[in-house]
Amino acid sequence: MSSFRSMLGVPPSTASTQDSVLVIIDAQGEYAEGKLKISNIEASRPNISSLLEKYRAANAPIVHVVHETPAGAPLFTQGTKLAEIFDELTPKEGEAVVTKHHPGSFADTNLQEILEKSGKKKIVLVGYMAHVCVSTTARQGAQRGWDVIVAEDAVGDRDIPGVDAAQLVKVALAEIADVFGTLVSSKDIN
C-alpha cells in the first residue's frame, strides 16, 4: 500500500541539526502529572531531551511551544507546575518560546516568523499530544510550505474514550506520514 505522498512522487525527508528547526510542542507538566497524563511519557520525554541536547550542541535553532489556558482553568493551570515546561527542557537564552492558545502552533502566534528567520526549510516536531497539537501543527506547517518531519519516538498521547494511547499515536502519525510529513526516529537526526 502506498502513501498519498509516495503516489505524488514526494520522497521521504531526512533531518539533521544543520538543516532543520526543532519545535518542541507542549512539553509541560500537565502531560507528566496532570489530568492529561501521557501514557508513554517515560519513553518519549527522554527522547525529546536527547534531541534538544543534539540541537543545542550544534547551536541549531530551537522553538519551545507552550500551551496557555485562561486563569483558573483545570488544565495547564497558570502559576502551577502543570503549566511549566519540563525542568530538563527549560529554554536557554536564544531559544524561542511561542505561547499558543489553540491546538495548532501556528494559529495566532509568531511561529511562522521565527521559522522564516531561521533560514531553514525543515521543521522537526516533537511533543504532545499526537492526535491534537502535534497533528494540527504538522498539518499547518505543511500548508505553509514547511518540510515537516516528526520524531515518532518523541511524541505521545493519552487514552481517550474508545481508543488507547498507543493506537491513537499510531493513527495520528500514520495520517501525518500519508500526506503531511515524514516520520523518523530521534536517533536518526544528527
UniProtKB/Swiss-Prot annotation:
Example of a GO MF term: isochorismatase activity
Leading EC class: hydrolase
Entry superkingdom: Eukaryota
Reported induction: Expression is up-regulated during the infection stages.
Subcellular location: Secreted; Host cytoplasm; Host nucleus
EC number: 3.3.2.1
Effect of D26A: Impairs the isochorismatase activity and reduces the virulence
Residue ranges of the TM segments: none
Function: Secreted isochorismatase required for full virulence of V.dahliae. Suppresses salicylate-mediated innate immunity of the host by disrupting the plant salicylate metabolism pathway via hydrolysis of its isochorismate precursor.
Gene field: Isc1
UniProt similarity note: Belongs to the isochorismatase family.
Protein's name according to its UniProt entry: Secreted isochorismatase effector Isc1
Active site per the UniProt annotation: D26, K100, C133
CDD domains, alphabetized: nicotinamidase_related
Positions in coiled-coil regions: none
Catalytic activity: isochorismate + H2O = (2S,3S)-2,3-dihydroxy-2,3-dihydrobenzoate + pyruvate
Chief localisation class: secreted
Entry keyword set: Host cytoplasm, Host nucleus, Hydrolase, Secreted, Virulence
